UniProtKB/Swiss-Prot annotation:
Residues 105-389 form the Protein kinase domain. The active site is at D229. A motif (Nuclear localization signal) lies at residues 420-427. Its EC number is 2.7.11.-. Disruption phenotype: Light green to yellow seeds. It is found in: Nucleus. It holds the Pfam family Pkinase. Expressed specifically in flowers and pollen. Keywords: ATP-binding, Kinase, Nucleotide-binding, Nucleus, Phosphoprotein, Serine/threonine-protein kinase, Transferase. This is Cyclin-dependent kinase C-2 C. The modification Phosphotyrosine is found at Y116. The protein kinase domain is predicted to be catalytically inactive. It comes from Arabidopsis thaliana (Mouse-ear cress). Autophosphorylated.
Length: 644
């Protein structure tokens, strides 16, 4: 009895903070039992405290031993050949494995390209077996990037299913900064097969592919793995008809701790679920089911069914295909900005119209997978148990599937490029849609002056002494003769000029100016050209009125450097053909008398097409050209007199 009562008292004191009974209210025997019980409880508490101190010390020793064991594991992995940056950041990813040597494989051509990886076909040197080497892109100096890469390795090691790509090894070395993942080589992917115009799948073949895809996805979801990048190019097929799900670079393991902390920036845009497009960060396996529905429709139609260029356009295409959600959907959704994605117009679903050749059970399965509400898409297991796979014709055996030449996404892109090139060649031969070719940019580049051939119609100025005929065109500090200049020059020199033969009797030479990014062309001998290029105060004829239109300041002509535009290089020779210092509109009698020191070189403030309202442009051009010829002739005569 005493033991029972003592246990009861002890139990009460443990359960709550109830006060002790007062000794006056109890008998002597009861008071004695209470005191004994409390003395026993105190002794038990002291024993527990001593035991906890001993356990605390043992916990500390265990922590120290764990830390030392972790360092020992890193040392063992480094001795096995793993790089130090991988052992320190993600040792668990390669625990128990030994790295493969790069010399054991002969890398061949590239067969795939992704955002975070590149895939190559390779041959194992010892056995001659074909494998696929996936080079993962990451920064080995950033631990987070290393752990992101290692997550794919951990997930692949966790999964083991005939319809999932199996990781066979890792190629790296102690001094390497890269990693290659070794997989079985698969000859095809669904993107290449479905887009091939020579391949048309039958319904039993489609069911065979879809069942294998759902089997592999069911294995992932049962282990808490969401793929998050299911698309046709990531679904691989070998010549035996076996389908395998690959590329787990964006996959993640969903746990209660991270269920509401996922990112919405996953899945390729054409296969992305609407809740991800709306910015959801709390989702489950239903995002993979939506992608499976997109792949299902792509196999049926031979092309992606939802090809949006932006997220908003992708949502709009989803509304047009699956119909706009009901009002109840917007009320139940927990997304903060979901109402901003609500369409202004109600869309009716057009999926049945686009899948007329599909059976009723197939359309129902496709509508289920492409449901706007994630809860209505079901699971991979429910899709496998749908009537589509339980009705005739049944899925065929994978070994009975036909064998095709290698077809991958890169092959499909190559076929599309060749098809476009052939179409362009046909249009070019027929003359339809032919466009005039614009002059090559190299003609305007001042660096290519010496490399370009001289135009045949360039008029050389002869019988003029070398010093008088030298054009002081300043381009990056180089000087060129008149006969060495091409017909067009770039904007860096501040002007462009060329003398051309004209078929008209007057043989008027014109100067052509090309603005950096303007399609308009303006004669270099016009008054407006000289004024806007060199800042001269020139007055055109009263009948010739011109305007400057446009405010494009991106086409401003570069200012001629002062150290390169000194008039000492020209001297007092007014016959020099330096376009940066010659007043083309000066009168014939004033030309040999005036100096060029009063000219101010500045930057063009307004760039744009110049429109002349008068029709007397030819007279201005002829007079200016006459002034140039007279200046050259008088300079020649003046030089001859000086030589005498």
């Amino acid at each position: 009895m005493g033991c029972i009562s003592s246990k009861n008292v002890s139990c009460l004191t443990d359960q709550g903070d109830s006060p002790l009974p007062e000794p006056g209210l109890l008998s002597t025997s009861q008071q004695h039992r209470v005191l004994i019980d409390h003395s026993l409880e105190a002794s038990h508490n002291s024993k527990r405290s001593r035991k906890s101190r001993r356990l605390g010390g043992s916990d500390l020793r265990i922590g120290v031993s764990l830390g030392s064991s972790h360092r020992n594991i890193e040392a063992e992995q480094a001795a096995a050949g793993w790089p130090a940056w991988l052992c320190s950041a993600a040792a668990e990813a390669v625990h128990g494995w030994v790295p493969l040597k790069a010399e054991a494989f002969q890398k061949l051509e590239k067969i795939g390209q992704g955002t975070y990886s590149s895939v190559f076909r390779a041959r194992e040197v010892e056995t001659g077996k074909m494998v696929a080497l996936k080079k993962v892109k990451f920064d080995n100096l950033q631990p987070e990037s290393i752990r992101f890469m290692a997550r794919e390795i951990l997930i692949l090691r966790k999964l083991n299913h005939p319809n999932i790509m199996k990781l066979e090894g890792i190629v790296t070395s102690r001094a390497s900064s890269s990693i290659y993942l070794v997989f079985e080589y698969m000859e095809h992917d669904l993107a290449g097969l479905s887009s091939n115009p020579d391949i048309r799948f039958t319904e039993p073949q489609i069911k065979c592919y879809m069942k294998q895809l759902l089997w592999g996805l069911e294995h992932c979801h049962m282990r808490g793995v969401i793929h998050r990048d299911i698309k046709a190019s990531n679904i691989l097929v070998n010549n035996k008809g076996v389908l395998k799900l690959g590329d787990f670079g964006l996959a993640n393991v969903v746990t209660p701790s991270n269920k509401n902390q996922l990112t919405s920036r996953v899945v390729t845009l054409w296969y992305r679920a609407p809740e991800l497009l709306m910015g959801s960060t709390s989702y489950g396996v239903s995002v993979d089911l939506w992608s499976v529905g997109c792949v299902f429709a792509e196999i049926l139609m031979g092309k992606p069914i939802l090809k949006g260029r932006t997220e908003i356009e992708q949502l709009h295409k989803i509304y047009k295909l699956c119909g706009s959600p009901q009002d109840s959907f917007w009320k139940r959704t927990k997304l903060p900005h979901a109402t901003s994605f609500k369409p202004q117009h109600t869309y009716e679903a057009t999926l049945r119209e686009r899948c007329k050749d599909l059976s009723a059970t197939g359309v129902y399965l496709l509508e289920t997978l492409l449901s706007m509400e994630p809860d209505k898409r079901g699971t991979a297991s429910s899709a496998l148990n749908s009537e589509y796979f339980l009705t005739r014709p049944y899925a065929c055996d994978p070994s009975s599937l036909p064998k095709y030449p290698p077809n991958k996404e890169m092959d499909a892109k190559y076929r599309d490029d060749m098809r476009r090139k052939r179409a362009n060649l046909k249009l070019r031969d027929s003359g339809v849609g032919r466009k005039h070719k614009r002059p090559h940019r190299a003609e305007y580049d001042p660096k290519n002056y010496a490399k370009l051939p001289i135009r045949k119609d360039t008029l050389e100025v002869k019988n003029i002494p070398n010093e008088a005929s030298r054009a002081t065109t300043t381009t990056h500090g180089n000087y060129y003769k008149v006969s060495d200049l091409p017909m067009t020059t770039g904007p860096a020199s501040g002007f462009a000029w060329a003398v051309k033969r004209r078929k008209d009797p007057d043989n008027i030479s014109t100067l052509t100016y090309y603005q950096p990014s303007s399609k308009s062309q303006l004669s270099g001998t016009s008054v407006a050209f000289a004024k806007n290029t060199f800042g001269l105060n020139l007055k055109p004829d009263n009948d010739s009125v011109w305007e400057v239109q446009g405010n494009n300041y991106d086409d401003v002509i570069e200012e001629v450097p002062s150290h390169e535009s000194k008039l000492s290089r020209i001297g007092e020779r007014h016959g020099s053909l330096d376009g940066s210092g010659l007043d083309f509109s000066q009168r014939e009698e004033d030309s040999p008398k005036k100096t060029l020191e009063h000219l101010q070189f500045g930057k063009q403030s307004i760039s744009g097409p110049l429109i002349f309202k008068s029709g007397k442009i030819d007279e201005i051009l002829q007079r200016n050209e006459s002034n140039i010829r007279q200046a050259v002739r008088k300079s020649h005569l003046q030089r001859e007199q000086d030589d005498r």
